[in-house]
Amino acid sequence: VVPAYYINLDRARERRDFMERQAERLGLRLSRFSALSAEDVDETRFTALAGLWERPMTRVEVAVLLSHASLWQKVADDDAPLAIFEDDAVLSPRLPEFLREPLPAYDLINLEYFARRKFFRRYASDGRMSDIARDKAGAAAYLLSPDGARKALAAIENHAAPADAFLYASGRLEMTQVEPALAVQAEVLSAKGIDPGVATVTQIHEPRGRLAPTSDNWVYGWRRTLTQLRLVPLHVGRGTFYEFREPRVDLSEFAPDQSSS
């Protein structure tokens, strides 16, 4: 069985209880990882990482990235795959069975439905998993292999980004998507009119102002432009080599957490 961890701030007791209730209901052994808070990120580390993406990262975003990276280090050290969840992931009843099955050879297996389209490779699906050419968003539920962990850790010092953007940077990891998806973030369910059973406001939701068009900020615009240029071949290949669509999901699986009532 692939071990499973969820990332949770010490002060986020409601989220912890939510994940523990799900684990009990599903018969899933789910361990807690104490997340780094913004206050845990020292100034030196923040300064080294915050300016490496397409806009300046917030201290909260750096803390979330480093929390994920701590579990990537565990994967690399143990030389064994790990399923990693954020504490607002609503889990499918099919998840425990999936974690007991033999794993295909990918760096990352995305377990999540995030309600955004992504690029899938055409003709690269076995009906249960579909190969991803380029993902976009969501790091609430994924399975990482030791090779994937080592690749991610090797890149973090020079290419830091918010956790999902970092994981899904073009060409970094070989990825596939479980279909139908095995997890959905609470805020995604809420947006679709489904009660997720937990509050949907997270520590990531802090205001960010627009980036001023100054000489100091040109590098961020340049990085965004490079990202868009990398997408051009994918868009050109749509319909021939790639499909641009949302992952398949059965939202009826993700009922409210009845054990809280």
What is each stretch, according to the model?
Residues 1-85, 89-261:
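An acidic/histidine-cluster motif and surrounding catalytic segment
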